[in-house]
UniProtKB/Swiss-Prot annotation:
Residues 63-66 are annotated as: G3. The keyword Cell membrane applies. PROSITE patterns: G_ERA, KH_TYPE_2. It comes from Lactobacillus delbrueckii subsp. bulgaricus (strain ATCC 11842 / DSM 20081 / BCRC 10696 / JCM 1002 / NBRC 13953 / NCIMB 11778 / NCTC 12712 / WDCM 00102 / Lb 14). HAMAP family: GTPase_Era. Residues 42-46 are annotated as: G2. GO terms for biological process: ribosomal small subunit assembly. This is GTPase Era. Residues 197-282 form the KH type-2 domain. The keyword GTP-binding applies.
């Protein structure tokens, strides 16, 4: 009789500086959007787990906020979220941007140097550099730390992602299936819905507005005329930011609402009625009690 293949499973942390493509990679791996993306750094604020399942393997990818030096209570929360994600994982994927390789990566590499678990160097955005540039990039990182594997990919185009999964499978321990096959994230629906709304704010606004914004889902009620009713509040720090979010004659808030509703309907697979409110909460990023009330609690990390 042939030998039955053993089931493999494990937790994998996606770590790297802001805006290197961690959320894009996780969405690519999962095959559906579970983490928001934008061109702006610090898009991800919380640890978000995406779940990839095959017949003989399950990987729980933990997408972390990009590590950077803290300037506010929210920034400190985001750094701690990244570091705490390394406590109980089986493997770390340190993601870097091929276009900016070597610039400022020493800080993150220093955090990973002493880990006693495999660390992969994932070089993203290889579609934006010449193939001849890859070897010098790899050589430069070999001098920085000890990496089990070097994996060039393009998260946006999918290049190298299948090879990444095959390599992961070689390193993961034998283990059970932790989540049902149809689960793609460990986050509740209301959290993902709030992130979808925040993503559109990041995409549509500029300057200090995107990162001065938080979103809280007040309620998700079953069905008004066959639709899911979602009420959410957008918090900003200044009156001027509120005016920008609302826009002239409500034009901006309408755009945010329409785009968010479309993303939420794609995620949930049902029609949605979305209502948005905008409130000023001055200096909320420096208010630990308020941060905790909307889901950012350093003590839980």
């Amino acid at each position: 009789m042939g030998q039955t293949s053993k089931h493999k499973s494990g937790f994998v942390a996606l770590v790297g500086r802001p805006n290197v493509g961690k959320s894009t990679l996780m969405n690519r791996l999962i095959g559906q959007k579970v983490a928001i993306t934008s061109a702006k750094p610090q898009t991800t604020r919380n640890k978000i787990s995406g779940i990839y399942t095959e017949d003989d393997m399950q990987v729980v990818f933990v997408d972390t906020p990009g590590i950077f030096k803290s300037h506010s209570d929210l920034d400190e929360y985001m750094d701690k979220a990244s570091l705490s994600s390394l406590k109980d994982v089986d493997l770390v994927m340190f993601m870097v941007d091929a276009k900016e390789a070597g610039k400022g990566e020493e800080y993150v590499a220093g955090l990973l140097k002493d880990l006693d678990i495999p660390v992969f160097l994932v070089i993203n955005k290889i579609d934006q550099v010449h193939p001849n540039e890859l070897l010098p990039i790899i050589d430069s990182y070999q001098a920085v730390g000890k990496f089990a594997e070097f994996l060039p990919i393009s998260a946006r185009q999918g290049n190298g992602v299948d090879d990444l999964l095959k390599t992961l499978k070689d390193y993961l321990p034998e283990g059970p299936q932790y989540y049902a096959s149809d689960e793609i994230t460990d986050r509740p629906e209301y959290f993902v819905v709030a992130e979808m709304i925040r993503e559109q704010i990041l995409r549509l606004t500029d300057q200090e507005v995107p990162h001065s914004t938080a979103v809280w889902v007040d309620q998700m009620n079953q069905r008004i005329n066959g639709k899911l009713q979602i009420d959410a509040t957008i918090f900003v720090e200044k009156d001027g930011q509120k005016r920008i979010i609302i826009g002239q004659r409500g034009s901006m808030i309408k755009q945010i609402g329409m785009r968010s509703r479309k993303e939420i309907e794609n995620l949930l697979g049902e029609k949605v009625n979305l209502k948005l409110w905008v409130k000023v909460r001055r200096d909320w990023r420096q208010d630990p009690a308020f941060l905790k009330s909307i889901g950012y609690d350093k003590k839980e990390l």
